[in-house]
């Protein structure tokens, strides 16, 4: 994605943030009150499947009590299949006691959750939410909805159900153990609806002691960015860094990396490029976003002109390593070549600029055409879902470069969760198929089967449509980059022409070589050593490459007006925090320049 989009790059993070592993937030809780017993939902539900005889016992039971009591008995025995039959007798009964029906609805939702029939459970909890506070289990349902958010993607509609509740309703004493989680989830819902004031208030209500505190602060910062309010965004992200610094929990690290990346993007958007490079450099090499942070850092260093060109080219060289084949965004890899060509052009190294353009033209247009064919051959959303599954598993039989590019845009966390949910629904269908035949013959089993099937069809359609849009967006990015490359090619030809005319008019090529200047100064401290790049990448050298760049323009070079440079996103100025040089700048490593030297870690 082009750095010309500035702040928009950050918004992608904001939307996908909830997909960061949140196992840290999955703790055991006291169950919602349901008339006795403790059966709180947890991150890992253990389902004990009933035997045929216990199901038959439910089917043959008559008299000796009410179905609701029978259901409670089976539930307490972990005989959830039999419990669903009894609760269904109450919910489906016409003209029965309304209070008993409402109780059975809630208990049916809990039971289906225990059976891991999450979509069916949600449909019963939705009945309760729609009835509002008049339903006796309205508040208790919130806890189970919170648990469902860990099992289902946002698109399943769980957040919308939580969004039906008022903030004041979260103060109910029954919700004490999950209140912070619900503040976070309700804030997240308001964020998706662009209700930024309400979402910030909710995020700020999450206790610093809560496992959801860090996520809430990240979303708070994202909300301020959406409002183009940089200073409080910076404060929120720095609070995440403070918590991470004081925590020994390794599960905090992904959030720390997101905070560093977000700070870098904010500072880039406010044209504080030195600060931007500082925070880009702090993203851990173990982070999923490290390759993309290297690319974005290249743009920030590019904006520093001569003081940043060496590192920008070094980062781009790093991204050419085979380690990043399936991690760098294909549009970023392609755009990196345009950055490389532009830097060489600005320094009158026209031959090398042309080489970078040639490399782009050798691969990108053909990959774009291959992706267009994939779109044309799979126009139905269900069809595209099927090809996307094959692409994600590396079994599409597409040309390798085409599959690699498509796979890169089909593995983002937001989309991946939808594919995972389809697999989860397939598991639910498989569990249904393996269930006791006596239970499968009941009306409740048929309703559950239909519910799962409908939800699967809807999710396949949604995932297929989203996957298609990802590929369409990539094709559009390639088209825009191709247009930029054509402009750069024209400027290179103009630059070569002017240089030749100047040589003829004023001096010989020999005199021009005398005027060449090398602006790159690579510093080596006691912990690093100078080492030339000889064509082989080493894992511990990635991210440290520097390029010894010469300027042949006879002056300082710079950024001519002919080629458009990226426009950072708008936003209020963020405060300086004292950094004057990019972090990691003292630890350079190899370069690809044939005349260059480099430093590398021991």
Residue ranges of predicted features:
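TPR-repeat structural position
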Residues: 80, 118, 155, 196, ...
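"A position-specific structural signal for the A-helix of alpha-solenoid helical repeats
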Residues: 69, 107, 144, 178-181, ...
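Extracytoplasmic/secretory-pathway proteins
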Residues: 27-64, 86-88, 116-120, 137, ...
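Alpha-helical segment of the N-proximal tetratricopeptide repeat
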Residues: 62-89, 181-194, 269
């Amino acid at each position: 994605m082009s750095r010309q989009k500035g702040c928009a790059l950050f918004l992608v993070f904001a939307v996908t943030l909830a997909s960061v592993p949140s196992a840290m937030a999955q703790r055991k809780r006291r169950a919602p009150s349901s008339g006795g017993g403790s059966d709180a939902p947890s991150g890992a539900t253990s389902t004990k499947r009933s035997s045929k005889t216990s199901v038959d016992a439910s089917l043959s039971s008559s008299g000796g009590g009410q179905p609701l009591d029978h259901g409670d008995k089976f539930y307490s025995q972990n005989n959830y299949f039999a419990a669903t039959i009894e609760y269904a007798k109450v919910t489906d009964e016409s003209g029965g006691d309304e209070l008993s029906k409402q109780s059975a609805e809630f208990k049916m939702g809990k039971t289906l959750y225990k059976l891991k029939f999450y979509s069916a459970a949600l449909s019963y909890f939705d009945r309760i939410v729609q009835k509002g506070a008049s339903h006796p289990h309205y508040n208790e349902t919130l806890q189970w909805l919170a648990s469902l958010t860990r099992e289902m993607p946002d698109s399943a509609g769980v957040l919308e159900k939580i969004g039906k509740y008022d903030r004041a309703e979260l103060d109910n004493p029954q919700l004490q153990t999950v209140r912070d989680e619900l503040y976070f989830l309700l804030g997240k819902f308001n964020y998706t609806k662009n209700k930024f004031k309400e979402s910030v208030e909710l995020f700020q209500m999450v206790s610093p002691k809560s496992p959801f505190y860090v996520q809430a602060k990240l979303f708070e910062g994202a909300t301020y960015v959406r409002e183009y309010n940089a200073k409080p965004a910076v404060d929120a992200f720095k609070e995440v860094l403070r918590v991470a610094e004081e925590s020994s929990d390794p599960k905090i690290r992904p959030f720390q990396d997101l905070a560093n990346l977000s700070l870098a993007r904010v500072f880039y958007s406010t044209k504080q490029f030195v600060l931007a490079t500082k925070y880009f450099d702090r993203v851990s090499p173990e982070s999923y976003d490290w390759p993309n942070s290297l690319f974005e850092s290249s743009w920030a260093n590019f904006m520093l002109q001569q003081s940043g060109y060496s590192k920008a080219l070094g980062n781009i060289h790093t991204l050419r390593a085979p380690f990043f084949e399936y991690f760098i965004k294909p549009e970023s890899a392609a755009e990196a070549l345009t950055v490389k060509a532009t830097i060489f052009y600005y320094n009158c190294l026209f031959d090398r600029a042309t080489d970078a353009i040639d490399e782009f033209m050798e691969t990108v247009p053909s990959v774009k055409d291959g992706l267009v064919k994939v779109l044309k051959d799979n126009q139905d959303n269900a069809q595209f879902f099927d090809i996307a599954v094959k692409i994600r598993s590396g079994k599409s039989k597409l040309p390798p470069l085409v599959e690699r590019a498509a796979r890169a845009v089909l593995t983002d966390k937001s989309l991946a969760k939808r594919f995972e949910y389809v697999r989860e629904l397939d598991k639910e269908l498989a569990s249904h198929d393996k269930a006791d035949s006596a239970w499968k013959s009941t009306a409740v089993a048929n309703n559950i089967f239909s519910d799962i099937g409908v939800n699967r069809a809807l999710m396949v359609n949604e995932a297929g449509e989203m996957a298609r849009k990802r590929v369409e967006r990539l094709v559009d990015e390639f088209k825009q980059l191709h247009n930029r490359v054509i402009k750069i090619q024209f400027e290179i030809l103009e630059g070569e022409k002017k240089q030749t005319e100047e040589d003829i008019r004023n001096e010989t090529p020999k005199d021009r070589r005398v005027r060449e200047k090398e602006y790159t100064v690579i510093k080596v401290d006691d912990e690093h050593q100078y080492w030339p790049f000889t064509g082989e990448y080493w894992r511990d050298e990635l991210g440290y490459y520097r390029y010894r760049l010469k300027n042949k323009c006879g002056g300082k070079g710079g950024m001519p007006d002919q080629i458009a440079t990226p426009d950072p996103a708008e936003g209020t100025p963020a405060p300086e925090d004292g950094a004057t040089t990019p972090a990691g700048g003292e630890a350079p490593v190899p370069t690809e320049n044939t005349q260059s030297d480099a430093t590398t870690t021991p």
